[in-house]
């Protein structure tokens, strides 16, 4: 086991605070509409230019072991805030730095760190309660666009695209972000259920100009096994042919004689069919097939329920108004499933989301809910270069998360004003002793810091602006984008309540831990191996021999 080094008391805290400051100073330059860029070096490929606080934080590793511990703790603030609310990472970092900086002064002066922490916790709880009181629900598309615009560092086109996407697919719908193929941002909305499997043979295509196989008013056969023998399919094919409607077959695979026969019948115009593989794998495939069955009013033909292909009838087949099958995707539009059954299925999946332990499982379950309840919107981010698209994509992701947070918990005036307004509730608090009162005063000072940083990044005098905003009431604040004072909600400077709340709670949590730390244990630095003297054979210096 490697030797460890231990540092105690003020020496440990001072080093930790240095690490906090190094990371926070790099992150906080990105805050606000006039925040600056940070360039991140990459081992491979071109550098990344970003205004995304959490992207900057994640890149930072310090050479000094103890400083690095401090930096990693603040990095945790940014990551936790990003995970919970999707935005507010820079605000959380600024708040954490301010609480640590102010708290360190009191600890150095001999105050009890535990009482300081109790005072900090009491003040934060009061601030959160007050935030909830001043929060108002997000109701209009305009407010959603404003929240998204602020989170995207003031880019209105991103805000409009996100608001439009939510309008089209609803609050439950899936919105994904992809690289675009042009300079402009685009919105592509898929109505109905789409899954990532395409036709098994290009001979199924009947719209060559769009490279699609399109079926109007089709039956849908869902099977959880491979189909290779055409004899298994014949009974159901005959029934579909008599009904005079096309057929979509979704199975684990369709191959050999079965696929060849379907292709020949399709080319000759005897029976219009398309075969696709079932989406997903294992248990997830079964669940997705069941989703499609419920959405289309059909049943999955599976031995588990006693159904076989030979005995399948039209009653077991699903129906839809239209199906479009491309090379890589299949889209079912307007399935014939009963709404109560679909709602029950959505409720069941939501219960699974609540119990899911991994982010991946949760994300996939949410996708299934969206496909059943709403639709899927794809925002394609455009740009002139790969670096520009990557930077813009980060901002679109932030804006998307912020918008969802706003829909969830409502909005408060942005630009750091909400944190100034909650100071009144904290100022009235009484601590159990002088040290707790000092903890409360730490939070009172820290709550000004996001506004101070936004103003400083805009090149203005922070103290003057903070005093002017504090003298105002309600939504009155400073719009750093225009350099004017006024009603921030009216001018569209909004923050999701969840983002502001999460940033404050996470910052206070980690800052409290840092202030109550009295020792650090870290790996001792390794001594560098001595350099080989020049002239030694094989050492690579002058006079080496072969």
From Swiss-Prot:
State whether keyword Manganese applies: no
**Which reaction is this enzyme known to catalyze?**
ATP + H2O + a folded polypeptide = ADP + phosphate + an unfolded polypeptide
Q: Where is the composition biased (Gly residues)?
A: 537-546
What's a GO cellular component annotated to this UniProt protein?
Answer: cytoplasm
Its Enzyme Commission number(s) read 5.6.1.7
The protein's matches in HAMAP family, at most eight in alphabetical order, are given as: CH60
- Which protein is depicted? Chaperonin GroEL 2
Which gene is transcribed and translated to give this protein? groEL2
């Amino acid at each position: 086991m490697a030797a460890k080094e231990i540092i105690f008391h003020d020496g440990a805290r001072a080093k930790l605070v240095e690490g906090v400051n190094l990371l926070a100073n790099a992150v906080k330059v990105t805050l606000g509409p006039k925040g600056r860029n940070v360039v991140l070096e990459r081992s491979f490929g071109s550098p990344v230019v970003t205004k995304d606080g959490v992207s900057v934080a994640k890149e930072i590793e310090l050479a000094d072991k103890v400083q690095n511990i401090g930096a990693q703790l603040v990095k945790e603030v940014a990551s936790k805030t990003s995970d919970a609310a999707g935005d507010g990472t820079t605000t959380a970092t600024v708040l954490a730095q301010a609480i640590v900086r102010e708290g360190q002064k009191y600890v150095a002066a001999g105050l009890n760190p535990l009482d300081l922490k109790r005072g900090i916790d009491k003040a934060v709880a009061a601030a959160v309660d007050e935030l909830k009181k001043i929060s108002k629900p997000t109701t209009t598309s305009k407010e959603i666009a404003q929240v998204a615009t602020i989170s995207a560092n003031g880019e209105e086109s991103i805000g409009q695209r996100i608001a439009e996407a939510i309008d089209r697919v609803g609050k439950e719908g899936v919105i994904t972000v992809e690289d675009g193929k042009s300079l402009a941002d685009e919105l592509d909305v898929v109505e109905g259920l789409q899954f990532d499997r395409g036709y098994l043979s290009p001979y199924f295509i009947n719209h060559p100009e769009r490279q699609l196989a399109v079926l109007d008013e089709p039956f849908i056969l869902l099977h959880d096994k491979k189909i290779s023998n055409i004899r298994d399919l014949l009974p159901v094919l005959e029934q579909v042919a008599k009904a005079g409607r096309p057929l979509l077959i979704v199975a684990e695979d369709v191959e050999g004689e079965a696929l060849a026969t379907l292709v020949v019948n399709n080319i000759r115009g005897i029976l219009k069919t398309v075969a696709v593989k079932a989406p997903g794998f294992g248990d997830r495939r079964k669940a997705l097939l069941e989703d499609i069955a419920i959405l289309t009013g059909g049943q999955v033909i599976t031995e588990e329920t006693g159904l076989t292909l030979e005995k399948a009838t039209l009653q077991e087949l699903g129906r839809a108004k239209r199906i479009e099958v491309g090379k890589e995707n299949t889209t079912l539009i307007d399935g014939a499933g009963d709404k109560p059954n679909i709602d029950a299925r959505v409720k069941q999946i939501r219960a699974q989301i609540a119990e899911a332990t991994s982010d991946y499982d949760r994300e996939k379950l949410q996708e299934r809910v969206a496909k059943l309840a709403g639709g899927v919107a794809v925002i394609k981010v455009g740009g002139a270069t790969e670096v520009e698209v990557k930077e813009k994509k980060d901002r679109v992701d932030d804006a998307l998360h912020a918008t969802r947070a706003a829909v969830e918990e409502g909005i408060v005036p942005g630009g750091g004003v909400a944190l100034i307004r909650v100071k009144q509730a904290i100022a009235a608090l009484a601590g159990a002793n002088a040290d707790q009162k000092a903890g409360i005063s730490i939070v009172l000072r820290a709550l000004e810091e996001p506004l101070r940083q936004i103003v400083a990044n805009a090149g203005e005098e922070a103290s003057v602006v903070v005093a002017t905003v504090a003298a105002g009431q309600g939504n009155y604040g400073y719009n750093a984008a225009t350099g004017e004072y006024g009603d921030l909600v009216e001018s569209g400077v909004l923050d999701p309540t969840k983002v502001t709340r999460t940033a404050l709670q996470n910052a206070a949590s980690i800052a409290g831990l840092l202030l109550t730390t009295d020792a650090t244990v870290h790996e001792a630095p390794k001594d560098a191996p001595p350099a080989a003297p020049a002239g030694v054979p094989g050492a690579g210096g002058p006079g080496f021999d072969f």
